[in-house]
Amino acid sequence: MSVASKNLFDLLGEETPAATTTEKKTAASRDKKRSDSPPVPRELVAQSTTSRKRDPNQPTPRERTVNKKADQPRRRRQAPQGNEAFAREGKEARANNAAHPVDATGAPSNRRNARARRGREFDRHSQTGRVDTKKATERGWGDLVNSAANPDVAENEGNTPSGAQTPAAEEENVKTLDEYLSERKSAAKPVGRTVEKLENATKVEKSAPEELFASLKKSASQKKSAAKESKPKKVLLDIEQTFTARPARGGRPNRAPRRGPSETASKTQQAPPTLSETDFPALA
């Protein structure tokens, strides 16, 4: 908001017309120069945040960390396993597991059965040129030495059936209750040793052995008895006690008042003197 100002001193007419015209000309020429001359671009310089103490040729701490990480070999991220893999893959993992068989034939894997099915093609150790040992051969096909020494036994072994000799059936031992009770009654009871009686024999009773030597170590019972004897015994005395009746409490005693002597005290202590003629002989 602009307010037009009015020069009140123009009424005095002190200013010359030449001065006003020169000032107007100078102001007009100044405005013309400003409008004719093109604007000069101003150079903006950013404030430097770097310290003068740091060497500009050396890399910054951030550049050092970036270069260090670039030089290190990139670690391979480990694939998830177990429950983590199952949780990440979800239904896809279950579908893939169901699609793939357990082994080549689709049967549950068993190392022995799998080895028997696949043969000896992928064995770690070669089996060419290997022969069973003598002990294994004799166990599987019999002992050749014993068969040659006892040909009769060998022939009998060949004629016998494959099964072993069946043992004879055992007879069942079954008894009734009456038979069992009768056997128990008939069984002889054990008889104790009979005491032989001797003639001209005297009865000897054993007594406690006498202590020939005083034992240095005391038994537990002796220690307890000695401890009981050493303890002081309590002595009880009979005392005759007499009780007297408590005297009855009297009334409140006469006490002097707080502000001066009491009336009773003044009567007893300050009684008026009795005067007689003997006290005044001059008046007789």
UniProtKB/Swiss-Prot annotation:
GO terms for molecular function: G-quadruplex DNA binding; RNA binding. Its main location: cytoplasm. Keywords: Cytoplasm, Phosphoprotein. PANTHER family: AT19571P-RELATED, HYALURONIC ACID-BINDING PROTEIN 4. Belongs to the STM1 family. Ribosome preservation factor that protect a small pool of nontranslating, vacant ribosomes in cells under nutrient starvation conditions. Under nutrient-limiting conditions, cells reduce ribosome biogenesis and degrade ribosomes via autophagy (ribophagy) or proteasomal degradation. To avoid excessive degradation during starvation, STM1 binds to and protects 80S ribosomes from proteasomal degradation. Under nutrient-sufficient conditions, TORC1 phosphorylates and inhibits STM1 to prevent formation of dormant 80S ribosomes. This is Ribosome-associated protein oga1. It comes from Schizosaccharomyces pombe (strain 972 / ATCC 24843) (Fission yeast).
